[in-house]
Amino acid sequence: HRLKVGYSAWTNPFNGVKSYVSYQNTRFIVFWSKNPAPLISHLDYLKERNIDCYIQFSLNDYEKEHLERGVPPLHFRIDTFKRLVDKLGKGRVIWRFDPLLLTTDISPDKLLQKIENIGDQLQGYTEKLVFSFADILTYRKVKSNLEKNNIPYIDWTEEMMCDFARRLVQLNKKWNYQLATCGEKMSFDGVAHNHCIDDNLIIRLAYNDKTLMDFLKVKTYPMPTADIFGEIAELPNDAIILPNSQYATHGNNQDKGQRL
């Protein structure tokens, strides 16, 4: 696997330029996958290398509609999710239902039922649900693939998205997950905008890694205690609560990587 080799190479299909990524100084990896089961056997190696991680697990349910070919059955993927959490911890595996796709066979009601089924089974195993609405008309390749496979899609309207988000927030009252959208311009009450690479989460998970924290420009402070009048100072708006009776703040970490 590429970590043992020490680097990865990628050739840009448009201009033929080859780029290299070195893993010599890697401290943290964020994984995205619809089927991260093969990763489980490599997690101990990451630990040996002192490389921390979290996983964005796209756990959808389009099984009956055969829209995601090549992924294992839903029950297997839910079991994989739980095995990953047992290995890594609840905060390190994020549930994504992405994208939310409407067809003549999949109504908003049916989508909510699919989400509820998975959400009920993941209670106690995740803290967060990230979702996005399939923007089919914007992505010609997606539109072409759906039409090629005779899948009669329905594009989301703003009114439909707002209503769906409202109903999902209501549904979430029994789970209390953090709800967040991915790549959506619209805002919805009770739903945050997700970060693809969430530096706040990385800090919360890897606050003991001084090298990484220095790179992320993190400063830590003791949690405020009551003064002689019993008053407790308010935390800053950007405070990240750590598990060691401290909180952290950080600088602007946007796009620290170099693109060749």
Kindly give the residue locations of the regions a language model identified.
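C-terminal accessory extensions appended to soluble enzyme cores
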Residues: E158-L260
